[in-house]
């Protein structure tokens, strides 16, 4: 996914090839954007009681129902 396409509040799904097995295929909500357009990590929340994770746009894709 391109950094420019990521919107706060959108649902995303972590890619199957993600480095941490426990996050692969998980669905979360983009809560925050950091950095600038050339170096932008996103804070993604995966549940009410789960800690938020910093991910790059290349590590997830938009999730559609």
Per-region residue spans from a language model:
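Basic/aromatic-rich interaction segments and small domains that mediate binding to polyanionic partners
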Residues: 3-64
């Amino acid at each position: 996914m391109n950094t420019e396409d990521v919107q706060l509040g959108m649902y995303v799904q972590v890619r199957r090839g993600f480095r941490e097995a426990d996050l692969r295929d998980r669905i979360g909500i983009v809560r925050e954007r950091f950095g600038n357009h050339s170096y932008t990590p996103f804070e993604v929340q995966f549940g009410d009681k789960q800690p938020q994770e910093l991910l790059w746009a290349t590590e997830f894709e938009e999730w559609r129902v």
